[in-house]
Amino acid sequence: KAVVLGKAGGTAELPCQASQ
């Protein structure tokens, strides 16, 4: 899920990785 959001948002990729 985090990967999909990151690709759609772009900047979301950074916070998503931190969450993982």
Swiss-Prot record:
Function: Accessory protein for MHC class-II antigen/T-cell receptor interaction. May regulate T-cell activation.
GO biological process: adaptive immune response; T cell differentiation; T cell selection
Membrane topology: Single-pass type I membrane protein
Keyword Membrane: yes
Localization annotation: Membrane
Quaternary organization: Associates with p56-LCK. Interacts with SPG21.
UniProt keyword Membrane, yes or no: yes
Keywords of the record: Adaptive immunity, Immunity, Immunoglobulin domain, Membrane
GO CC, one annotated term: membrane
Protein name: T-cell surface glycoprotein CD4
